[in-house]
From Swiss-Prot:
Taxonomic path: Eukaryota, Metazoa, Chordata, Craniata, Vertebrata
Superkingdom: Eukaryota
Name assigned to this protein: NK1 transcription factor-related protein 1
Family: Belongs to the NK-1 homeobox family.
Protein's cellular compartments: Nucleus
Keyword presence, DNA-binding: yes
Amino acid sequence: MSASGPEAPGDIPALPPPPQPGSGPAPPAPAAAAQEAMDGRAELPAFPRAGAPPLAASDTVPAAPEGAGAARPAAPLRPTSFSVLDILDPNKFNSRRRRCVLLGPVAPAACAPCASAPCAPAPAASGRPPRAEELERRALAGAGGVGAAGAEPPNAGDPFKAGEAETNDTNGYSSGGGGHSPSADSGDEVPDDEDDDEDEAPETEAARGAEEARGGGGGLGARGSGCQGAAETDASPGATVDEAAAPGPRENSPVAQGPPGGAAAPGGAGTTPQGTATAAKPKRKRTGSDSKSGKPRRARTAFTYEQLVALENKFKATRYLSVCERLNLALSLSLTETQVKIWFQNRRTKWKKQNPGADTSAPTGGGGGPGPGAGPGTGLPGGLSPLSPSPPMGAPLGMHGPAGYPAHGPGGLVCAAQLPFLSSPAVLSPFVLGSQTYGAPAFYAPHL
């Protein structure tokens, strides 16, 4: 036992805690070594206060001055070991805190022994009044519902605790019992405005009330240790109550509050979709109105002057185009059939507004618009008359009878078969032209 004592200073993290309290009889421990041990513990209040999990490094440092300090013959080895621990402690605590965070909901049970076993007897063994004062301050802060600012002043005098609190704040963890979830403290998307400041008070009160109900000493130890499992489980009911009770301020905030609230805690995900929906509804309405007013339903066709002149001339000839007329006109003007059709629809609407009492079935006939009783062939485009020996090629496609009905024949027969008959002036008679208006094929014309 005594042989292992001198080797302890070199291997303090690997030394198991149980053999040390009973390692040898109580020898005349040097006063300097005991004093340095007490001073070292006074300089490291973060060990019991932070409530670290009972790992080797944290157990050997408080237990070493009680039993193993007597077996060490050389006093200079003591401050060396403590200086090394002083340098390494904050990193160890941060890594343990992250392990507790990874545990999730099971973290409170895992952190309970670390809060009860090392933290409770340590103040009695060392007899340090700052620990009792800090416990009283935290209890008062928890009873009064003070936020994280009220619970952090005890850390001002401790350089290690203050550094630890700074690292926790930068990482987004709640230090000193703030009761906030990491995403709520980090503030990734939510702006730090008045609405969030107003919402923090009920959240902290609810979290502290839940923690006091679970148990005063253990809850404070778990909170001081920074194990985020307890903070998250306590903060989730507060977050749900906060979002459900005060939806108004969160809706008015410029940034949507849904995503950070949803990432805060699994318990608060029940109400976050509603908050997201209420916050996004005005945006959807605005985007909907913008899309209705500014969305181009169809690309507006910019007709050239030649296209407009040709379309106007065609409309003067006839207000209704057949399939063949529309196809030929679209091909001649380098337009699509849909563009020609829409232009004629709009032009007919304009014409009806300009001539409210006019008969829509009558052809325009060069702008004059002969009535139903007009002579056959007067409305033919290109000045086509029944006796014209050489009608233009576009005339048969735009041919209409006195009643103004389009010459819709079976398939493309009318368009293709009218050409040979209309090319011979002997066949062109008013009777033949009139018979074509009812869609009869051209090869029936001589028999009629």
